[in-house]
């Protein structure tokens, strides 16, 4: 008897192929098509993106860490059980924890800003839907009255979902967690675009389940930040935050992103110590006009009012364009 040969795996189920160098193009496309399908199903069209450090903890977490370190230091002093090297490391850990305590206000303020934006976004979605319904009725009446068969009543965009703008973060701890937390406190949905890292950045618990994503490729993750983003908020952070800020600024400066996108740089004192934007302009590395791409802010209320006014202005401009260009 001839032995029955096992079926070969289908290509799209062949894990060995999918994880090989030859399967890279499929993996890249998957990180475009799968998020696109899920976001469309959730009716997410516009986001407000929060960038910032994963290391900025909540005041409660920092206080607990600092207390634990000080207790360890006190116990070691009583027993004289630490070497000079370990004692110096403990002292440095306490110094860092004290610095993190100063920065922890950004966690609270990030959560508050996300809450304010989400509450406004939910209210705006309902208001926009009502306006769109009126506009549709008026267009339909005009179409009959004036006998204009080509007027497309559906050209008036509606945002019938419950949230006009959805808060989007990198999905991890720190400022990312604060953003998702604030959105949840407001009763809204929020997105987490996580990234697989060697030290395992786990998704925070405040992300909406169906909007929790995990990326392998940084550039595909960045694409979704930029593509859906209608406003950016940059909180204090390290290399990753700097990379995200400057990539978005470069795309806007060079016209690769053609949409108007308000950018709030949050924490003036921190950022002016890290980057001297004025000196970049002084040396001619950027233009004076480029400085207008950034709005510095130091309170949730100021950042909220700026983003709200800018997005409202841009939204009304789009609405006017659509009403005057029914085939757009």
Where do the model's predicted regions map?
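Short, solvent-exposed amphipathic alpha-helical segments in soluble enzyme
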Residues: 65-68, 184-185, 247-252, 279-282, ...
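Glycine/threonine-rich flexible loop motifs
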Residues: 61, 242-246
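Solvent-exposed alpha-helices and their adjacent loops that cap or buttress functional pockets
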Residues: 40-43, 157-162, 184, 204-206, ...
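Short, acidic/small-residue loops that bind anionic groups at enzyme active sites
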Residues: 189-200, 235-236, 249-277, 288-289
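Glycine-rich beta-alpha loop segments
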Residues: 2-11, 15-189
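Phosphate/pyrophosphate-binding betaalpha-module
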Residues: 168-169, 173-235, 246, 271
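Short, well-ordered amphipathic alpha-helices
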Residues: 112-122, 245-253, 275-281
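C-terminal functional extensions of proteins
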Residues: 265-328
């Amino acid at each position: 008897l001839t032995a029955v040969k096992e079926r070969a795996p289908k290509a799209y189920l062949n894990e060995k192929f999918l994880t090989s160098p030859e399967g890279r193009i499929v993996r890249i496309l998957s990180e475009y098509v799968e998020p696109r399908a899920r976001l469309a199903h959730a009716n997410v069209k516009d986001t407000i993106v929060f960038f910032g450090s994963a290391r900025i903890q909540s005041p409660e977490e920092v206080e607990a860490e600092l207390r634990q370190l000080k207790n360890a230091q006190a116990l070691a002093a009583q027993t004289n059980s630490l070497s000079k090297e370990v004692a110096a490391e403990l002292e440095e850990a306490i110094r860092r924890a004290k610095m993190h305590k100063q920065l922890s206000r950004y966690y609270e303020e990030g959560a508050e800003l996300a809450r304010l934006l989400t509450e406004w976004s939910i209210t705006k979605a309902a208001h926009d839907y009502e306006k769109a319904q009126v506009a549709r009725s008026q267009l339909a009446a005009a179409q009959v009255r004036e006998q204009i068969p080509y007027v497309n009543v559906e050209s008036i965009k509606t945002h019938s979902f419950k949230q006009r703008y959805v808060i989007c973060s990198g999905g991890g701890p720190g400022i990312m967690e604060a953003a998702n937390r604030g959105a949840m406190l407001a009763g809204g949905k929020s997105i987490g675009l996580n990234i697989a890292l060697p030290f395992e950045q786990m998704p925070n618990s405040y992300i909406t389940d169906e909007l929790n994503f995990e990326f392998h490729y940084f550039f595909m993750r960045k694409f979704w930040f930029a593509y859906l983003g209608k406003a950016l908020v940059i909180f204090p952070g390290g290399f990753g935050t700097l990379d995200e800020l400057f990539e978005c600024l470069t795309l806007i400066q060079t016209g690769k992103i053609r949409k108007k996108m308000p950018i709030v740089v949050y924490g003036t004192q921190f950022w002016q110590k890290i980057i001297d934007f004025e000196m970049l302009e002084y040396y001619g590395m950027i233009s004076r006009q480029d400085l207008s791409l950034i709005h510095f802010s130091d309170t949730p209320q100021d950042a909220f009012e700026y983003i709200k006014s800018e997005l409202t202005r841009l939204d009304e401009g789009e609405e006017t364009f659509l009403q005057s260009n029914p085939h757009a």
